[in-house]
Swiss-Prot record:
Gene3D superfamilies: 3.40.50.20, ATP-grasp fold, A domain (3.30.1490.20), ATP-grasp fold, B domain (3.30.470.20), Carbamoyl-phosphate synthetase, large subunit oligomerisation domain (1.10.1030.10), Methylglyoxal synthase-like domain (3.40.50.1380). Residues 403-550 are annotated as: Oligomerization domain. The large subunit is composed of 2 ATP-grasp domains that are involved in binding the 2 ATP molecules needed for carbamoyl phosphate synthesis. The N-terminal ATP-grasp domain (referred to as the carboxyphosphate synthetic component) catalyzes the ATP-dependent phosphorylation of hydrogencarbonate to carboxyphosphate and the subsequent nucleophilic attack by ammonia to form a carbamate intermediate. Mg(2+) 2 binds at residues 299, 301. This is Carbamoyl phosphate synthase large chain. Mn(2+) 2 binds at residues 299, 301. ATP 2 binds at residues 717, 756, 758, 763, 788-791, 831, 843. Mg(2+) 4 binds at residues 843, 845. It catalyses: hydrogencarbonate + L-glutamine + 2 ATP + H2O = carbamoyl phosphate + L-glutamate + 2 ADP + phosphate + 2 H(+). Residues 551-953 are annotated as: Carbamoyl phosphate synthetic domain. GO terms for molecular function: ATP binding; carbamoyl-phosphate synthase (ammonia) activity; carbamoyl-phosphate synthase (glutamine-hydrolyzing) activity; metal ion binding. Belongs to the CarB family. Composed of two chains; the small (or glutamine) chain promotes the hydrolysis of glutamine to ammonia, which is used by the large (or ammonia) chain to synthesize carbamoyl phosphate. Tetramer of heterodimers (alpha,beta)4.
């Protein structure tokens, strides 16, 4: 069937900010979709609120709307653009729910727009728990016994029928949000209550426990001719009970019998047909009872999902790309395979390798959170590895996590473990925590049997045998300290790193590497080709293995290598992948062969056609150096970029240079200079710049002396970290001692850095480019919150709205002086604080920052592309002349009338609960906790801020009640904004002390009891919030460590029910402006292309006046 000719324009709904359960994989999927639609000659319209995505680059769509993904806003875009169709299946749950709302409110019918990729009936059948249960029954398959409920009374009645434990699954949520395992009535009240609230239809499925069953997924595609393919089978190593996003997974499924697989396949094909997905992909999850082989269907996603990205990277089959073509009317047999160029998409991929995905968690950011893994997803990222066998892939994936202790350790204890020790270790394997797989390996190493560990974990014995095989291989290595060739080859075939081998034979990693190279034991690089080498592969997508024959083809000119950022984590996310992708794209355009090294299956950078060659490898020195050597052997290497992927590649810079690898852009020496307190202070002194008083301490006595000299409060942090890891504001000596006692986990070989904390300062962020001579300031961002909240968690605005022109000039001059003094060649990010009109330098990061995408979108200048070209020898002057950078202005001299852009963050507190079941404290501080960001852009700040809040999931109310409870230090500054809220007609609710201050200033408020002071049936503020009687909260914390008192319980209640909460006076002021604007007029929607046109016109007008 040819492409539908009645479609001329398509609106794609993106997934919005990166959140747990819906992350970078939707940028990968969406970018593929946009490229397909453009190639087909369609007018492409995109709505996505996330500026850190590649898909929101203006070049990928004809009209790119960085606007809130709400039904109201998307309807405005439809009314303006009048698309023929909406494609909602590539933006995760956000896009699906928005599409359903547009159908329900009549907007699609009103404007004559159809859904493509999946229709409303198919979405409802796949997502509605009760409807899907009927689908499964009609297909002759089984679901787990279950009951649908819409209230707690119904849930309690269902519990008597199903019995405990049972699984709670809300409808229409993502990443298992609101789901869990209820072992008793208390659990049921807590989990089902949250689930009913999180489900947009207030619907929850209560399901019989199938804990301990084996869990599988099938990635399916179906076209309009009823051709169905199974793209990939995925098996969870963890049994049912741990969300698939938090489980170690493997592709293809390894422990299914052929009979079980065929049964599962038959069910999946019947289900996709019955649901009616006929122009796209879907994901179906199964559970198999290990003793009887009974198969039940768990759930279905009638859209491209998180697993689709993994399956695409695992197989080389671009699911999102093909799903988009199917939505346009093509059939699978009409779509060519990009990799082989000979087979159609109707050929199911065949794998001659094993893929393992391991999740990455961030519990260190939420120390109060319960680390138990359940059906609610908690991981913030993932790493993937490919090997010729399971053990090789598993070990490569584990070391790709880059976390201390993430790889297996095979050191045996000095004393042989006794029965009690073994029993204790086996007992630990029952705990479903992030340590589970390592606990399994330790128990087996100590002498536990596979049967014992299987009894404790329900992990399939085949996987346990493989882990036991690793322990046995470790013993072989231990018994051969001379490292004979057979031993080394065997170790490498099972994925042992040089560091692991060195640990076993008491040799340094470099010595092991020297022995290995002397024996010519090196990896070869195989190709992901979708067909198990049956046809030639035309896309060089490689993975390492200690096999015989390499498949890296010779190349004619030296390559440029870009090191990616590895698995997403808090502090290092999609923003860094953005810079890597831009560098690869612009360098290819400039005629270079580019090589990407990364291990993150979610990202655009690991798409097989972004770079000339892709190596899916861990970002360790050993693995990167082997790729370097492979490139050198087949055509040469110009150099390596380490400044684009965040802290991960930066940590490798010095070792790579020492090994003779040319580093492109900023040198390792300059990187170290910026981190070295003494050297950096010298640069600032020479430039006449000031820092907050500071010192460097190696022990508590030194730290105590420095803190007393500087004066409390002080900001304490380790060196060489990203995302404020381990950073804390300390108010007294006891807190300082507690911090240092715990800080060794953060960066053991580095001293603690101590700074005077500047209270009430305005924080300023700058992204700039320097070529050794000229500086281009990309943007100056003013933080909306005062200093003290990590820049990655703070809302900011560009251009700045309260900085005087002379401050902007001082910032610009300081930026250039620091870039020159440090010796930057490429990007630099600087943070300043303005206190009492004195400009202080907080820190300099000579690399791509997380704000580069935001600055690029806000100003229309591709900063990462410019940085890559500077790294290969171009100058700022040349880039201005070529139009890569503006010829007549930079981020400090933006034309008058430049739109205002606000960046707001998205926080994951609703995902994390304490062991008692309460939400963790949402109080922000100097350690970063946000997972993603959104952008609001408009002519004026007030509307841009309102858009950003709506996009982040916390739309501001225009009426209702405002609860106010502020610390003593904030009471004076809070009076005026609270008075203005009262004047707008908001009911003011406050606690006793705050109420008295407000009353003395002529502001009447309803007094509510503090939680600790409530008597009898008297409602507390937490009760009012939970009951929906509070619409906005203003709660500033007292100094010192936040007590688990009223403040915490107020914030926890607000997080649970999603009430917008302001914790600083400046944030309340911004909210006041936004609410006032919203009450006066409805905002317009404007595409980035229109904003850029306005910028060009304004710049031209100003240039002509000059």
């Amino acid at each position: 069937m040819p492409r539908r000719q009645d479609l001329n324009s398509v609106l794609v709904i993106g997934s919005g900010p990166i959140v747990i359960g819906q992350a970078a994989e939707f940028d990968y999927s969406g970018t593929q979709a946009l490229r397909v639609l453009k190639d087909e000659g369609l007018r492409v319209i995109l709505v996505n609120s996330n500026p850190a995505t590649i898909m929101t680059d203006p070049e990928f769509a004809d009209a790119t709307y960085v606007e809130p993904i709400t039904p109201e806003t998307v309807e405005k875009i439809i009314a303006k653009e009048r698309p023929d169709a909406v494609l909602p299946t590539l933006g995760g749950q956000t896009a699906l729910n928005t599409a359903l709302a547009l159908d329900a409110n009549g907007a699609l019918e009103k404007y004559g727009v159809e859904l493509i990729g999946a229709d409303v009936d198919a979405i409802n059948l796949g997502e509605d728990r009760e409807a899907f249960k009927g689908v499964v029954e009609r297909c002759g398959a089984e679901s787990a016994r279950s009951v649908i409920v819409h209230s707690m009374d119904e849930a309690l009645a269902a519990a008597e029928q199903l019995g405990y434990p049972m699984v709670v699954r809300p409808s229409f949520t993502m990443g298992g949000l609101g789901s869990g395992l209820a072992y008793n009535e208390t659990d049921l009240h807590r989990i089902a209550g949250a689930g009913i609230q999180y489900s947009p239809t207030s619907e929850v499925l209560l399901e019989e426990s199938i804990l301990g069953w084996k869990e599988y997924e099938l990635e399916m595609m179906r076209d309009a001719k009823d051709n169905v393919v199974v793209v990939c089978s995925i098996e969870n190593v963890d049994p049912v009970g741990v969300h698939t996003g938090d489980s170690v997974t493997v592709a293809p499924a390894l422990t299914l019998t052929d009979r079980e697989y065929q049964r599962m396949r038959d069910i999946a094909i019947a289900v996709i047909r019955e649901v009616g997905v006929d122009t796209g992909g879907c994901n179906i999850q199964f559970a198999v009872e290990p003793d009887t082989g009974r198969v039940v269907v768990i759930e279905m996603n009638p859209r491209v999902s998180r697993s689709s990205a993994l399956a695409s990277k695992a197989t080389g089959f671009p699911i999102a790309k093909i799903a988009t073509k199917l939505s346009l009317g093509y059939t699978l047999d009409e779509i060519p395979n990009d990799i082989t160029r000979k087979t159609p998409a109707s050929f199911e991929p065949t794998l001659d390798y094993v893929v393992v995905k391991v999740p990455r968690f961030a519990f260190e950011k939420f120390p109060a959170a319960d680390p138990t893994l359940t059906t609610t997803m908690k991981s913030v990222g993932e790493a993937m590895a490919i090997g010729r066998n399971f053990t090789e892939a598993l070990q490569k994936a584990m070391r790709s996590l880059e976390q201390k202790g993430s790889a297996f350790s095979f050191a045996r204890p000095a004393v042989e473990p006794g029965p009690n020790t073994v029993a204790r270790l086996v007992s630990k394997t029952e705990e479903t925590t992030t340590e589970r797989l390592r606990n399994v390996q330790r128990a087996l190493l100590a002498g536990a049997t596979v049967e014992q560990v299987f009894g404790a974990t329900s992990i399939d014995p085949w996987f346990l045998d493989q882990i036991q095989l690793l322990n046995e291989t470790a013993d072989l290595i231990r018994e051969d300290p001379d490292l004979h060739p057979e031993t080394l080859r065997e170790a490498k075939r099972h994925g042992f790193s040089d560091a692991q081998i060195g640990e076993l034979v008491h040799l340094d990693e470099s010595v092991v590497r020297g022995i290995r190279h002397a024996l010519d034991i090196r990896p070869v690089y195989k190709t992901v080709d979708t067909c198990a080498a049956e046809f030639e592969a035309f896309t060089p997508y490689h993975y390492s293995s200690y096999d015989r024959e390499t498949e890296v083809a010779p190349h004619e000119k030296p390559s440029v290598m870009i090191l990616g950022s590895g698995p997403n984590r808090i502090g290092q996310g999609i923003e860094f992948d953005y810079s890597c992708v831009h560098a690869s794209m612009v360098l290819r355009e400039a005629g270079y062969e580019t090589v990407m090294v990364n291990c993150n299956p979610e990202t655009v950078s690991t798409d097989y056609d972004i770079s000339t060659r892709l190596y899916f490898e861990p970002l360790t020195f050993e693995d990167v150096m082997e790729v370097v050597e492979a490139e050198r052997r087949t055509g040469g290497l110009l150099g390596v970029f380490v400044q684009l992927g965040g802290q991960t590649p930066l940590k490798l810079a010095a070792d790579l240079k020492a090994a003779g690898v040319p580093i492109l852009g900023t040198s390792p020496e300059a990187i170290d200079l910026a981190e070295d307190r003494g050297e950096f202070a010298r640069v600032l002194t020479e430039a006449g710049l000031r820092q907050p008083k500071n010192g460097t301490a190696h022990d508590f006595e030194e730290a105590s002396r420095i803190a007393h000299e500087i004066g409390y409060p002080v900001l304490v942090r380790p060196s060489y970290v990203l995302g404020g890891r381990g950073m804390e504001i300390v108010y007294d000596e006891a807190s300082l001692k507690t911090y240092l006692d715990n800080a060794t986990e953060v960066s053991p070989s580095r001293p603690a850095l101590i700074d005077k904390f500047l209270e009430d300062a305005i924080e300023i962020d700058v992204d700039a480019l320097f070529d050794g001579r000229d500086c281009y300031v990309g943007g100056i961002m003013e933080h909306i919150e005062e200093a003290g909240i990590h820049s990655g968690d703070s809302a900011c605005v560009l251009p700045p709205i309260t900085l005087a022109p002379d401050v902007v000039t001082r910032v610009r001059e300081a930026t250039e002086a620091i870039a020159r003094g440090v010796g930057v060649k490429g990007l630099i990010n600087l943070q300043f604080a303005l206190a009492s009109d004195v400009l202080y330098v907080i820190e300099a990061n000579p690399r791509a920052s997380r704000t580069v995408p935001f600055v690029s979108k806000a100003t229309g200048v591709q900063m990462a592309k410019a940085a890559a070209l500077i790294g290969t020898g171009r100058t700022v002057a040349q880039l201005r002349a070529e139009g890569v950078l503006p010829a007549d202005h930079d981020g400090t001299t933006l034309p008058e009338g430049t739109p205002t852009a606000v960046k707001e963050v998205v926080l994951p507190f609703a995902r994390f609960r304490t062991p008692e079941g309460t939400v963790v404290d949402s109080l922000l501080g100097p350690e970063m906790r946000s997972t993603g960001e959104v952008m609001g852009v408009d002519k004026y700040f007030d509307t841009a801020f309102a858009k950003a809040q709506a996009a982040a999931g916390g739309p501001l109310p225009t009426s209702g009640s405002l609860f106010v409870s502020v610390a003593n230090k904030d009471k004076r500054s809070a009076v005026i904004p609270v008075k203005m809220f009262a004047d707008l007609g908001f009911e003011i609710v406050s606690t006793g002390g705050t109420a008295e201050v407000l009353r003395r200033n002529g502001i009447e408020s309803t007094v509510v009891a503090k939680i600790a002071d409530a008597e009898g049936e008297e409602p507390t503020v937490a009760d009012l919030i939970t009951d929906g009687r509070i619409d906005l909260i203003f709660n500033t914390p007292s100094g010192g460590q936040a007590a688990r008192g009223d403040g915490y319980q107020i914030r926890a209640a607000a997080t649970s029910v999603g009430v917008p909460t302001m914790t600083t006076v400046s944030e309340l002021g911004a909210a006041l402006q936004a609410i006032t604007a919203q009450r006066q007029y409805s905002w317009d929607v404007t595409s980035l292309q229109e904003h850029e046109q306005t910028l060009r016109e304004r710049a031209a007008q100003e240039a002509s006046r000059d």
